Every structure is written in C-alpha cells, then in structure tokens.
C-alpha cells in the first residue's frame, strides 16, 4: 500500500547564523500553602479534620520557556513550552507529559497570532478572565466541570486583537491525543471560538466550545458549552457576573445539561493583598 502525505503548512524555529533579534525567557510560578480541611471522609463518624501542605492553590505551580524570533517585516516566530510541578513534593504534575500545560510553535504579526500544538482553548482563556477566582485550581467553581476542555492537543489556534476586541478560534484534530483515526475525522475533535471586548474598566466576553466523542463509537456525540460574562473595575474593586450553559452526551449514556450562574467581587486591600468572594 502506498501512503501519500501532503504537508499543508509547517511552522518551526531553527538555529541560524542570521543576526535577527531574538529572545528566550525562562519563567515560572511558585504557589504553595498550608490548608485546613474539616469533615474529611474517614473511618470516624462525621469525618475528620486535616492539615496539609498543598501546591497550586490560587495558580498552578509551573515553569516554562518562551521564545521570540524577529523574522523582519513585522513578522515573528514564537514558541512556548510549559510544565506543571508540585512544590510540596517536587514531582511533575503529569507523569506522562513533560510539557503538560503547553507545547506550541507559531507565527505572529499585527494581524494576530497563529500557533500549532498543545495549547489553551478559547473556553479556558475566556473563563480565566471572567471567573472571580481566576480559575484557581482548588477554589474555582469551574474546577467542578471535569470535562471542560482547558487545553487541547494537536490544535491550530488563532488570536487577534483589534481596537479592544480580541478574537480567538481553535480547531483540534484530537483533543486528548487519542483521535486522528484514519477514515473518521470526528473522533476526539474540539472546536471553539470566543470574543472579548475590553474598554477602560469594562470587559465583556462570550465563548462557544464543542467536543466530539473520543472513540469511533461516540464520534457523532458532542459536548457543547457556551459562556457569557462581564467584569467592571471601580477603584480598588472589580465586580464579575456571568452565565455558562452546558449540554453533553459524549459518554456511553447521555448526561444531563447544567447551568452555572455566578457573581463575585475582588477587593485590593493593599498592592500585595486581595480579598475575593464569589
């Protein structure tokens, strides 16, 4: 059997002898704390209390590399590699992926940014901005949505900013890496699009996300999500409000739809201390 391949596009960064302006940045976030829990399930009636050290409370602990290469004419090549780590143990967050949070390469210009690889979805990007808790790993309401596609493998993503309006679109050939099945392009597919408008203190966003089943048997089934929300900053405070709709049936049995309504407030007591309620 002869297998034919057509390369539609290829993006990459290569070492050259050209004297183009370039940079590579090593960055990271360290988040560790002490947590007290009550009524933890145990052998004791009514549960027990627990004190423990935790990593990734308000933000996932991580490290990464981010690079930019000036190609001239307003065009630049970019890449990002990011890995989650646990500061309480030093272990990787994902034992099978070194760069579990992102691994992409792309091109950018005044018309926007086009990237290929593992990257965040429009649903994640929009929720991160409109969630009062900032998608905090341990405390955000949205962490209860186990199927929310925060990141997608094998993804093409476009992001452009035009006079305060950010437009983002993503298409993943296989969100979890289990798709790309010959003869069935629907398996594990993920699509999403979002609009975010920011002007002064006001931000308004909307996003739609769709996931196909991850097996051939469930490829025609879909998880659908839509979200709309807004935030407004006044003085040291910032208010949030929003709504998320969900309907899905990618599993063996259809699941019930769900709705989430939220409101919240952040208040900066000092430059280093912020109170959040939601």
Regions found by a protein language model. Give the residues of each.
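Gram-negative bacterial Sec-dependent N-terminal signal peptides
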Residues: 1-21
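Glycine/serine-rich loop-strand microenvironments at binding/catalytic pocket rims
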Residues: 18-55, 258-262, 271-278
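Active-site cleft segment of glycoside hydrolase catalytic domains centered on the general acid/base Glu
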Residues: 182
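Detector for outer-membrane/organellar transmembrane beta-barrel domains
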Residues: 185-278
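Residues that act as N-cap/strand-start positions at coil-to-secondary-structure junctions
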Residues: 45-47, 99, 152, 189, ...
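Gram-negative outer-membrane beta-barrel proteins
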Residues: 34-42, 85-91, 122-126, 175-179, ...
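Short alpha-helical scaffold segments that flank and stabilize functional sites
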Residues: 12-13, 23, 31, 209, ...
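Outer membrane beta-barrel
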Residues: 22-36, 50-174, 187, 196-200
């Amino acid at each position: 059997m002869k297998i034919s391949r057509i390369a539609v596009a290829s993006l990459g960064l290569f070492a050259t002898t050209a004297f183009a302006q370039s940079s590579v940045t090593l960055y990271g976030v360290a988040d560790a704390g002490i947590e007290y829990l009550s009524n933890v399930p145990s052998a004791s009636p009514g549960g027990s209390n627990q004190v423990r050290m935790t990593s990734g409370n308000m933000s996932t602990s991580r490290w990464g590399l981010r690079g930019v290469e000036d190609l001239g004419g307003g065009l630049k090549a970019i890449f990002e590699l990011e890995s989650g780590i646990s500061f309480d143990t030093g272990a990787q967050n994902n034992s099978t992926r070194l760069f579990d949070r992102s691994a992409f390469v792309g091109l950018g210009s005044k018309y926007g940014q086009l990237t290929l690889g593992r990257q965040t979805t429009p649903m994640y990007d929009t929720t991160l901005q409109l969630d009062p808790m900032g998608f905090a790993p341990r405390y955000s309401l949205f962490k209860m949505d186990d199927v929310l596609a925060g990141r997608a493998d094998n993804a093409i993503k476009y992001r452009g900013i035009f006079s305060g309006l950010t437009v983002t679109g993503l298409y993943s050939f296989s969100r979890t890496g289990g798709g790309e099945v010959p003869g069935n392009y629907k398996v594990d597919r993920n699509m999403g699009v979002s609009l975010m408008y920011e002007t002064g203190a006001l931000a308004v966003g909307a996003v739609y996300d769709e996931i196909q089943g991850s097996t051939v048997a469930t490829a025609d089934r879909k998880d659908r999500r839509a979200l709309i929300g807004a935030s407004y900053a006044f003085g040291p405070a910032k208010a949030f409000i929003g709504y998320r709709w969900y309907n899905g049936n990618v599993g063996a049995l259809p699941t019930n739809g769900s709705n989430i309504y939220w409101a919240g407030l952040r208040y900066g007591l000092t430059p280093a201390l912020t109170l959040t309620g939601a």
